[in-house]
């Protein structure tokens, strides 16, 4: 069967469109990052991702148009979340220790990357527990939304102007 009703050609076109939209989102958010701050952009992006992901789930039965519109809205918020996250980390990094801080940032991301696949699969498995017999793949969205929600909650606890003392 086709995932989300996309054949191979549709996936390629969606991938191209998604990257263009994510790039536009990152460019626009880059300007706003300087005005509003990285934390604000990341929070707005996470909220946008959660709302768009929920919309994709709710309107999944509308077919491929849902995945095109909802997916591109998701892409619009992915770019800013990624770019502003790097800016946010750079503002925390003390002079001369940027390599260490970004190394830890990258290590943490790689160490936790298994969570998305795990939560995707667990959510799909949960759909069977609820007796869903068709379009189970869409349920994977809930696992990803949960990860984003946890990230949002953790980010809200971070002081936007930390007083970090990195002494050796």
Label the model's feature ranges.
Residues 65-80:
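Hydrophobic core of transmembrane alpha-helices in multi-pass small-molecule transporters
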């Amino acid at each position: 069967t086709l995932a989300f009703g996309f054949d191979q050609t549709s996936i390629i076109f969606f991938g191209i469109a998604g990257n263009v939209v994510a790039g536009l989102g990152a460019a626009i958010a880059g300007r706003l990052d300087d005005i509003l701050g990285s934390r604000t952009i990341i929070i707005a992006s996470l909220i946008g991702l959660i709302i768009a992901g929920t919309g994709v789930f709710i309107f999944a039965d509308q077919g491929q148009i849902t995945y095109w519109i909802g997916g591109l809205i998701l892409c619009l918020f992915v770019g800013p979340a990624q770019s502003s996250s790097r800016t946010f980390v750079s503002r925390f990094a003390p002079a001369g220790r940027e390599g260490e801080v970004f190394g830890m940032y990258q290590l943490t991301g790689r160490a936790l990357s298994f969570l998305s696949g795990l939560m995707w699969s667990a959510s799909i498995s949960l759909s069977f527990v609820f007796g869903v017999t068709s379009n189970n793949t869409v349920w994977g969205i809930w696992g990803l939304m949960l990860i984003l929600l946890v990230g949002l909650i953790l980010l809200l606890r971070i002081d936007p102007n930390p007083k970090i003392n990195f002494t050796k």
